[in-house]
């Protein structure tokens, strides 16, 4: 479900424990696409890791994705991709746990974050 701004989500209508709507909303517009499977997997990832997760990117509106030079068919546009800041954490541990909770796509080539998504199985 798409909301024009994350503050439109009804009180009590957010079932996710570890992430607030503003953390997974588009950073450029405040829009939020609630992808229930992806958000549940993200919550499970946080629970299984046992430490906080900070996101550098989650849902992106088409406008914001274009503005920042994102891929035209980015998984961020469907609300099922997240860029997880490493902050000294082991990238491979995050990848393994993310795979266990249902993520299939992994962008490992970045220095400061790991990209995880619910798309097709692949690693780059």
Report residues per predicted region.
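Extended, low-complexity, intrinsically disordered C-terminal regulatory tails
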Residues: 37-69
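Generic detector of short, locally flexible boundary/turn motifs and exposed helical patches
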Residues: 18-22, 46-52, 79-83
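Catalytic cores and adjacent binding grooves of peptidoglycan-active enzymes
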Residues: 73-124
């Amino acid at each position: 479900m798409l909301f024009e701004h994350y503050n439109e989500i009804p009180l009590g209508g957010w079932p996710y424990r570890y992430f607030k709507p503003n953390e997974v909303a588009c950073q450029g517009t405040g829009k939020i696409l609630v992808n229930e499977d992806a958000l549940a997997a993200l919550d499970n990832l946080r629970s299984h890791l046992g430490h906080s997760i900070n996101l550098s990117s989650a849902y992106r509106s088409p406008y914001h994705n274009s503005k920042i030079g994102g891929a035209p068919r980015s998984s961020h546009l469907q609300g099922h991709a997240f860029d997880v800041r490493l902050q000294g954490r082991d990238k491979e541990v995050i990848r393994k746990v993310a795979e266990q909770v249902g993520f299939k796509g992994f962008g490992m080539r970045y220095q400061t974050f790991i990209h995880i998504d619910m798309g097709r199985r692949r690693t780059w």
